[in-house]
Amino acid sequence: MSMSDPIADMLTRIRNAQMVEKVSVAMPSSKVKVAIAQVLKDEGYIDDFAVKAEGAKSELNIALKYYAGRPVIERLERVSKPGLRVYRGRNDIPQVMNGLGVAIVSTPKGVMTDRKARATGVGGEVICYVA
């Protein structure tokens, strides 16, 4: 059976792993998932990630980050879904928690944060909110 929303699956795996205080979480890899993991790492929400290739299939391993015994990621919410895509122009990209959180946006120039998209002057599909 094929997965209808691999990005939502990735976010759910991260949320579930953090609820049981796992050190890392593994999932099937894709270019978009790796790009999202890179943004999460750059913003300090995860420790690290690695892609392990086994023949035709590859696996993405994400090392989760905790501070004082609590997960660094408090909120991880999917915005644009397969049934309802959410696109925003460069002037309409939302701020998460008045700039304390991050919106991850897929733009023609790659996957980036809301701040970088505004600075670059591009809009795109709002993938998720992270806080």
Curated annotation (Swiss-Prot):
PROSITE patterns for the chain: RIBOSOMAL_S8 (PS00053)
Pfam families: Ribosomal_S8
Keyword Methyltransferase applies: no
GO biological process: translation
GO MF annotations, alphabetized: rRNA binding; structural constituent of ribosome
Disulfide bonds: none
UniProt-listed InterPro entries: Ribosomal_uS8 (IPR000630), Ribosomal_uS8_CS (IPR047863), Ribosomal_uS8_sf (IPR035987)
Alphabetic keyword roster: Ribonucleoprotein, Ribosomal protein, RNA-binding, rRNA-binding
Gene Ontology, cellular component aspect: ribonucleoprotein complex; ribosome
Similarity comment text for this entry: Belongs to the universal ribosomal protein uS8 family.
Role description: One of the primary rRNA binding proteins, it binds directly to 16S rRNA central domain where it helps coordinate assembly of the platform of the 30S subunit.
Self-association state and partner proteins as the record states: Part of the 30S ribosomal subunit. Contacts proteins S5 and S12.
Record protein name field: Small ribosomal subunit protein uS8
Organism whose genome encodes this protein: Burkholderia cenocepacia (strain HI2424)
Native organism taxonomy: Bacteria, Pseudomonadati, Pseudomonadota, Betaproteobacteria, Burkholderiales
Gene (name only): rpsH
